[in-house]
Amino acid sequence: MRRTIRALMLALMLALGPAVVLVAGPAAADEIQRIGAPASPIASAVIVPAGYDMIYVSGITPPVLNPDAPAGTPRDFGDTKTQTIGVIERIKGILEAQGASLADVVMMRVLLVGDPAKGGQMDFAGMMEGYRQYFATEAQPNKPARITSQVAGLVAPGMMVEIEVQAAVKPD
């Protein structure tokens, strides 16, 4: 039984392998390859060739928008969309200080806390509204590989978004 499953898996991978490569399109061996469906705002995989400098950005949380709001409420940081924009702007600044940009992001991990206004469910749509302003756009078409997960909480009450990224930059 296990041999049959392994044989089927191998056949499937061999059959789908060329399709995945075709989606990535031709790329020079020394260029980053972003693989995935063209209509998707995220890459299924990103291949970074040897020789690139990697920048690892720790989990970044949103800035306080309203210091007069009651402590521990989302109004301290805004809704999920607002928090996502604030976090990505912070990441953008960190990357720019290192000579990189959001176009260099190859991997992203998004942690979302459930929104009390949504019955404790993560606001994936709100996060995507913020995300789509920066990635897979006409001005910045590069898409990172990404994971989005709901977590129980972050470091401060009212925070609903934390994002960690890895960026790859070709040395001069």
Which residues make up each language-model segment?
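N-terminal secretory signal peptides that target proteins for export/translocation
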Residues: 1-7
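N-terminal presequence-like segments and the immediate start of the first folded domain
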Residues: 8-89, 93-109, 115-172
